[in-house]
């Protein structure tokens, strides 16, 4: 698309970043200054009753800056990147029609990618193929399947952890059904986003700082009643660790503790480690992201001013 035709498109802002990087605080600050409406881009914040462990904006923050696409699913329900793209496009159109600018904030990079580039033509799930993969995993272990994926699709294998059976089996399933790798197919994009997008990523300057913030926030969640929140979900009786909601970072580890599989201290250790691993994956995505303007979490006023400098011209 030419620069002239791109300039005629409606405007949008992406505010991306790893967990615990200060995205929400910056988005709320920007809403006070710019004519923006916030849309959450987070695969955990969609779930009702999952507030503490997801660091969902609190009532005061939501009063100051309402977020769209929060609390739109029960934890028993699935929600795909395709669902997100459909819902986000509808919200963006609504915001644009009101003469305001959509500000999409979150850390689910797959959602941002699906929105920006469109969805690739991946084959639908095949229960027979999936059952065959799971049978092989039961006999040989997921490590063996991960080695198989390394031979078939080394790019996907580098991105998918051997302990992530859902994504691992999906990558193999796609290849067995289509004869093409997940990497090949995901490079075939769908409809591009019909907006002129200003993209920002916020993160601390050092990994050590991010690790500290993650550990502090996990302990704050525990002090705020995270265990009681997960106990309420656990007591429902219809939720389990095969659901995307309960596989969310922190929830999965607390669930293992409630089931008596691990000690409290082990749960805390694993929860912090899993959150750090999530942040590492998010940063890896962002480092390969084109056209992104980096902001420093430790300098919030400077970060705000940099956004205003870049997008100030579009706010009129």
Curated annotation (Swiss-Prot):
Residues 42-45, 166-170, 247-252, 280-287 are annotated as: Interaction with substrate tRNA. ATP binds at residues 17-24. Pfam families: IPPT. Its EC number is 2.5.1.75. This is tRNA dimethylallyltransferase. It catalyses: adenosine(37) in tRNA + dimethylallyl diphosphate = N(6)-dimethylallyladenosine(37) in tRNA + diphosphate. Monomer. One of its GO terms (molecular function) is ATP binding. InterPro entries: Dimethylallyltransferase, IPT, P-loop_NTPase. GO terms for biological process: tRNA modification. HAMAP family: IPP_trans (MF_00185). It comes from the Bacteria. The gene is miaA. Belongs to the IPP transferase family. The record marks 108, 130 as: Interaction with substrate tRNA. Keywords: ATP-binding, Magnesium, Nucleotide-binding, Transferase, tRNA processing. Substrate binds at residues 19-24. Catalyzes the transfer of a dimethylallyl group onto the adenine at position 37 in tRNAs that read codons beginning with uridine, leading to the formation of N6-(dimethylallyl)adenosine (i(6)A). Its cofactor is Mg(2+).
